[in-house]
């Protein structure tokens, strides 16, 4: 793996949540997270941790049927998009860029589940691939045009 990729293991969903909370403290305003993994891999659990780390006290739920959930009560907004039920053309009409361009919505952290349905990837993002591994999850981080050192995002040993 090169300097733009890293892998590590989280032993359970609680650790995934804890890492999400840690991540929220480190990510800069305007971060786009592309979440990949099978159904039930822990994508929403990670976003729940991100929300807690941002100080969001309300319930954070999967936007599978609402497509987008917006949480604005934390230290910065959190936008959670789930594109699972949409095709590329439907995603294009959703205009997901509005959540990370900072023009129509205040900048925050945008987490996108099923990003392969995006008609075009953003120019800068952090991709997080979650894979089942027993009770835990293997995590692969990949950065695209990312200024931050990925080692800073690793969970504590």
Swiss-Prot record:
ATP binds at residues 40-45, 135. It is found in: Cytoplasm. Its main location: cytoplasm. One of its GO terms (cellular component) is cytoplasm. One of its GO terms (biological process) is tRNA threonylcarbamoyladenosine modification. It holds the Pfam family TsaE. Keywords: ATP-binding, Cytoplasm, Magnesium, Metal-binding, Nucleotide-binding, tRNA processing. It comes from the Bacteria. Belongs to the TsaE family. Required for the formation of a threonylcarbamoyl group on adenosine at position 37 (t(6)A37) in tRNAs that read codons beginning with adenine. Is involved in the transfer of the threonylcarbamoyl moiety of threonylcarbamoyl-AMP (TC-AMP) to the N6 group of A37, together with TsaD and TsaB. TsaE seems to play an indirect role in the t(6)A biosynthesis pathway, possibly in regulating the core enzymatic function of TsaD. This is tRNA threonylcarbamoyladenosine biosynthesis protein TsaE. The gene is tsaE.
């Amino acid at each position: 793996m090169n300097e733009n990729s890293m892998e590590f293991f989280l032993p359970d969903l609680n650790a995934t949540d804890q890492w999400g909370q840690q991540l929220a403290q480190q990510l800069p305003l305007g971060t786009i997270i592309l979440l990949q993994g099978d159904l039930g891999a822990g994508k929403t659990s990670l976003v729940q941790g991100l929300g807690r780390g941002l100080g969001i006290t309300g319930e954070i739920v999967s936007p599978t049927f609402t497509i987008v959930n917006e949480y604005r009560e934390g230290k910065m907004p959190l936008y959670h998009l789930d594109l699972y039920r949409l095709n590329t053309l439907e995603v294009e009409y959703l205009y997901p860029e509005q959540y990370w361009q900072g023009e129509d919505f205040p900048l925050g952290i945008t987490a996108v589940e099923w990003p392969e349905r995006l008609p075009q990837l953003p120019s800068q993002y952090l991709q997080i691939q979650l894979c089942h591994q027993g009770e835990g999850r293997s995590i692969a981080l990949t950065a695209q045009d990312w200024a931050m050192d990925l080692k800073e995002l690793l969970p504590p040993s």
